[in-house]
């Protein structure tokens, strides 16, 4: 998942509306405590990446990670529907830009592991957090990374023919 984190962070650095930098944070990885920022520390629009577990692929060999990717921005007036709609539209475009870029043939040639990115059945939902004045989009999708194997032949010592409870 570290490679995916670095990849999405690099897209946040390259995107014209984001320009993520250390001194101007527009990205955080939810599964890393050092990336936890307070809303006052974030620069908007903001990209959040995280994962909430995995499923084992049909062949029983690999993990298919459930990934959450979100783009959010802050609005100054939560009562202004026009401002909220513009914020949601802006975040939707940025999220779409990231997904389209990661699915492009050019990116898949440079980063062969992106072949495991599966957007079929991906669910996107608008975010409306009125309490924090944050609006945007979140999408949940899957990715199967070739090096995330479930089986590991070196994990076990030589098999013992006896059960532990037998003398």
Across the structure, where does each feature detected by a protein language model lie?
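Oligomerization/assembly interface segments of phage tail-like spikes and tubes
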Residues: 61-77, 132-147
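Acidic-leaning, charged glycine-interspersed low-complexity segments
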Residues: 1, 16, 20, 40-47, ...
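Extracellular/virion structural assembly segments
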Residues: 2-9, 60-64, 72-100
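Small/polar-rich, solvent-exposed N-terminal microdomains that initiate assembly or binding
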Residues: 1-60, 153-167
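Generic alpha-helical propensity signal that fires on short helical segments
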Residues: 65, 87-89, 155-161
């Amino acid at each position: 998942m570290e490679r995916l984190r670095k990849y999405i962070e690099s897209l946040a650095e390259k995107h014209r509306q984001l320009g993520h930098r250390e001194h101007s944070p527009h990205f955080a990885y939810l599964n890393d405590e050092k990336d936890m920022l307070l809303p006052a520390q974030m620069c908007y629009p903001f990209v959040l990446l995280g994962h909430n577990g995995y499923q084992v692929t049909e062949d029983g060999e690999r993990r298919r990670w459930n990934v959450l990717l979100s783009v959010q921005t802050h609005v100054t007036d939560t009562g202004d529907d026009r401002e909220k709609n513009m914020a949601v539209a802006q975040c939707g475009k940025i999220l779409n830009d990231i997904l389209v870029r990661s699915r492009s043939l050019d990116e898949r040639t440079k980063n062969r592991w992106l072949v495991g990115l599966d957007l079929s059945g991906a669910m996107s939902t608008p975010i409306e957090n009125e309490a924090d004045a944050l609006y945007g989009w979140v999408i949940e999708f899957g990715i199967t990374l070739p090096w995330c194997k479930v089986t590991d032949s070196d994990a076990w010592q030589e098999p013992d023919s006896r059960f532990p409870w037998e003398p």
